[in-house]
Structures are given as structure tokens and as C-alpha cells.
Regions:
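C-terminal motif of bacterial Sec signal peptides marking the signal peptidase cleavage site
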Residues: 13-16
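Acidic, glycine-anchored loop motifs typical of Ca2+
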Residues: 135-144
Length: 230
């Protein structure tokens, strides 16, 4: 399975619209300027919905403690992890996190914000970033989202609106099965020698299956060992 992140970031920016949109508000209606107490990092996690993965529910490296059994608890976990500058795993394809900032991020046309990721050679897992402008000023991620174009946008091998459905294992310490919108199927392997938590399927998702949708990028990392180890 192609393991790529789908990262959803709620960023308050000053200019982002479709050509068909009719904007009636003025900039001042929704622009939130920086203040002396503004910080560069995200200040709130609205939602944390990872795909299944080896670090999900994991109590050592992953930092879970078994109490993340509701969406609210999962969001609180993710917020604290990022505050402590620890990683937050998004699992397999489609996992996402929605964060907000205490000020608007100006769209200068250059690099206006950054998203940290896995920088190890052979473990590069690119993400898709979406942004949203808080036009109604209610501080919630409830308006139109826009996917930022990247180096792979528009290429034939890039699949838009790709989806993967994950299925809860019938018993502990088993792989997570998945199917996708292209007619493929597979599994997220259970690595008992490394991560022995009972389930790689998020504990706070009550349904026996859930579907994540996003943009699928061409695979760039391959199993060179022939054993699935590297």
C-alpha cells in the first residue's frame, strides 16, 4: 500500500478563493492580525483522525496512554504532542490533522508557513496540505477548503479524490485490511517485533470501517530488502 500522508491544516489566510467566488466581506471582516502574544505555531487542534498505523495507540514512541477513546481525547493528545515538539503519526494513507492559529497567515506568494515531516532518507512521506480562511470569524474550520498545489499537481500519476477504506481487525494483534477506490486491496501489517499494542486501528473510531479521501501521490519509496523491512 502506498503510505502517504494526507495533512489537513486549518490556516487563516488573507487571500484564497475560486475564480467563481463572490467575496462580499472586506479584508477587515475576517483578518486576524498578529499581536504581541501571537505565536508562530498552531494553537489548537480541531480534529485528529489518522489512518491505522504502527504508532497509533502505541504507548512508547507514539505517546498514547490508552485514554484516547474519544475524538476529543485524541485531539487533546495531538495538541500536547505538538506542544512538546513530538511527532504526531498520521498512519497510512488519508490520515489527517486539523489545526488552527491565533492569527491570519498572510499569503505573500512565497513560503508563508511550514509543516514538519519525516526527514530520514528512505522514510520521506510527503503530505497534502489544505487551507481554509475563517471568513465568518467564528474560529471554526467550517468553511471552504482549498488544496495547495504542489510539485506533483496535475501529473498523470497523481490521483485526485482517491479513497481508502480501513477495516477493524476481528481480534487483537492482527493486520488492518483495506480496499481503495481503484479496486485494490491489501493490509497494514502488524509488526509484533516492534509495536505490540493490540490494535493499529484508532481506538476512538467506533465504526468497524472508515473511509479517508485525498490526493494519492506516486510511490517513491520501495521495499529494497525484499522482506518489507526497508
Amino acid at each position: 500500500m502506498k503510505k502517504y500522508f494526507y495533512l489537513l491544516v486549518a490556516i487563516l489566510i488573507t487571500s484564497s478563493c475560486n475564480t467563481d467566488d463572490v467575496i462580499t466581506e472586506t479584508l477587515e471582516d475576517h483578518y486576524r492580525a498578529k499581536t504581541e502574544i501571537s505565536v508562530a505555531e498552531q494553537t489548537i487542534v480541531f480534529e485528529y483522525t489518522p489512518a491505522p498505523g504502527q504508532f497509533i495507540n502505541e504507548t512508547k514512541t507514539g505517546g498514547f496512554d490508552g485514554t484516547q477513546t474519544t475524538p476529543e481525547a485524541a485531539a487533546t493528545y495531538a495538541a500536547q504532542r505538538m506542544k512538546d515538539e513530538n511527532f504526531v503519526s498520521l498512519g497510512g494513507f488519508g490520515g489527517y490533522i486539523v489545526v488552527g492559529f491565533d492569527h491570519s497567515i498572510d499569503n505573500s506568494g512565497g513560503y508563508d508557513f511550514g509543516v514538519k515531516g519525516n526527514s530520514f532518507k528512505g522514510s520521506s512521506e510527503p503530505g497534502i496540505v489544505w487551507v481554509m480562511q475563517d471568513q465568518n470569524g467564528n474560529g471554526l474550520p467550517d468553511e471552504t477548503w482549498y488544496e495547495l498545489a504542489g510539485s506533483e499537481t496535475g501529473k498523470p500519476e497523481t490521483i485526485q479524490n482517491y479513497s481508502v477504506t480501513y477495516y477493524r481487525p476481528s481480534e487483537p494483534q492482527k493486520p488492518v485490511q483495506w480496499t481503495d477506490s481503484e479496486g485494490n486491496s491489501g493490509q497494514i501489517d502488524y509488526w509484533k517485533q516492534y509495536h505490540r499494542q493490540d490494535y493499529y486501528y484508532p481506538l476512538w473510531i467506533e465504526e468497524d470501517s472508515y473511509t479517508l479521501i485525498g490526493t494519492c501521490l506516486k510511490a517513491r519509496n520501495y521495499d529494497t530488502s525484499g522482506k518489507g523491512t526497508y
